[in-house]
Regions:
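Structural signature of nuclease core domains in nucleic-acid processing machines
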Residues: 1-272
């Protein structure tokens, strides 16, 4: 009788998550902070429970794949060139040939398994990648002198007692010995305003500044690789170190809450 009287459904409340193990390097990197700031529940589901969002069907190359391809081409170029002077020494034709070689090399594994339609899409992607990378390299050619210190550099960083692994897209050493930290984006929507506020919407670059050491960083930028919008967007300590970026000025937005460039970087570190 007792068995028959049992409830049809039983409720079990378990609000715990898998515990961190000692010295565990938590997956997620900058996305860990991005999700935690926007929605802690989603951060827990995606990064602790392994939940994944369903992919949305799209014509052509998916946005995430396009981003990886652009990163790979730029990495290949700067792995070999390293110095702005090498870029400046190239003729226009040499620059095109160099970039085309890297683009074709990056796309080769995809071409090996593509059908006729896929091959045509990759032809279009090849032209798009080549044009956009050349546009960003032209931006680099117009900058003050620099040397590329790191490309796709892996680091493990401690944030609030949690260790996570990040990859710095690119770090340039400038003429005065300080660093410019660059994060590539293949969408036009990324704005430096996303670094500001108590909960930065896009914390990657503040996190990269922390990894490098804020006292050594004099410029922070998105490298936008996008049709009609390929450019560098970000902030610099002054107008000399990285002329394409907005120089720090405590009397104008968005810097009015900060007494100095160092004060801004310290605020980012504190918020992380």
């Amino acid at each position: 009788a007792q068995f028959e009287a049992r409830p049809v459904l039983e409720t079990l409340i378990d609000g715990s998550l898998p515990a961190f193990t000692p010295h565990e390097v938590v997956k997620g990197g900058a996305r860990l902070l991005e999700l935690q700031g926007a929605c802690p529940f989603r951060a827990a589901v995606e990064l602790r429970l392994g939940g994944v969002e369903l992919e949305h069907p799209a014509a052509g190359i998916a946005a995430t794949e396009r981003g990886k391809l652009a990163h790979a081409v730029l990495q290949a170029f700067w792995d070999k060139a390293r110095e702005q002077s090498v870029l400046l020494a190239m003729t226009a034709d040499q620059r095109v040939a160099n970039v085309r070689t890297h683009v074709r090399s990056v796309l080769a594994p995809l071409r090996a398994t593509a059908d006729a339609v896929g091959t045509r899409l990759l032809d279009l992607e090849e032209r798009w990648l080549e044009a956009r990378v050349l546009e960003l390299l032209q931006q680099d050619a117009e900058r003050a002198p620099f040397t590329v210190e790191f490309v796709e550099e892996p680091r493990v960083i401690d944030v609030g007692g949690v260790q996570t692994r990040i990859v710095l897209d690119r770090v340039d050493r400038l003429a005065d010995g300080t660093f410019a930290v660059i994060d590539y984006k293949t969408g036009a929507s990324a704005r430096p305003a996303a670094w500001m506020g108590e909960r930065p919407e896009l914390p990657q670059l503040p996190l990269y500044v922390r990894a490098i050491g804020q006292e050594q960083v004099s410029a922070v930028a998105f490298g936008i690789v996008c049709t009609g919008s390929t450019e560098y967007r970000g902030f610099a300590r002054d107008g000399e170190v990285f002329p394409q970026l907005k120089p720090f000025d405590a009397t104008s937005a968005p810097f009015t809450d900060y007494a100095s460039w160092g004060d801004l970087l310290q605020a980012w570190n504190r918020r992380l």
